[in-house]
A protein has these predicted regions:
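Conserved hydrophobic/amphipathic alpha-helical signal-anchor segments
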Residues: 22-63
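S/T-rich, low-complexity, solvent-exposed segments of bacterial secretion/appendage proteins
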Residues: 159, 174-181
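Short, low-complexity, Pro/Ser/Thr/Gly-rich segments in the mature regions of secreted, periplasmic
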Residues: 191-205
């Protein structure tokens, strides 16, 4: 009996961590798939309406795509901060005279979301979605509108794995403790709690 219990204990030590690791990895895979799906939706919107409008703290591109009938729900992934319940109401998008505008709403800064910013030359890990070096060295063209998915408070390990899935090893930080400046997935070095906000390039115009 003792031998059986010992075997069970050993198996638990070996198997349980692998189960949790598999679950964590599947959440990152889900996030990567959600980001990839956004690319075609943004392309569809641009084909119909042209240049995407820029966002501010209260406005979200995923709310815009939802209003335009091109998304069924807000951008939600299984890693990072989960949506508030009830959801924090963002700006309302309105289409008039050939242009989309947003008004009202509360700040979405604590929520994972989709944004559009005018590019700058800040290092990608500190640009908050306004710059990427897709080839590992070259900033985006000045004045571009940059569409990004934002995942708030991902762990360093989640951020690194997401980068590995979308960018490959060449543009992924060597450890989960470092900032990532290269490729489509960028983020600052995780904080003392091991968390960081991840910005993922979707498109630029």
């Amino acid at each position: 009996m003792i031998g059986v219990l010992a075997i069970i204990a050993i198996l638990a030590v070996v198997i349980v961590p692998k189960v949790f690791s598999t679950i964590a990895s599947s959440r990152v895979t889900n996030a990567a798939g959600s980001v990839t799906a956004l690319k075609s939706t943004v392309t569809e919107f641009a084909g119909k309406y042209g240049t995407l409008p820029t966002t501010v703290a209260a406005s979200r591109i995923d709310d815009l795509l939802l209003t335009a009938g091109m998304l069924e729900s807000r951008f939600v992934v299984k890693i990072g901060t989960q949506p508030a319940n009830p959801p924090i109401v963002g700006a309302t998008w309105t289409y008039a005279a050939g242009a989309w505008t947003a008004a009202g709403g509360a700040s979405q800064a604590t929520q994972s979301r989709v944004i559009c910013l005018v590019s700058n030359v800040t290092a990608p890990s500190a640009a908050n979605g306004a710059n990427y070096q897709l080839d590992g060295a070259t900033d985006l063209p000045a004045g571009s509108r940059v569409i990004s998915a934002v995942i708030v408070n991902a762990t360093g390990a989640e951020a690194r794995e997401l980068s590995s899935k979308l960018d490959g090893d060449a543009y992924t930080a060597t450890t989960a403790l470092l900032a990532d400046n290269a490729g489509k997935v960028v983020y600052a070095a995780p904080n003392a709690a091991g968390l960081t906000t991840v910005y993922i390039y979707i498109a630029s115009q």
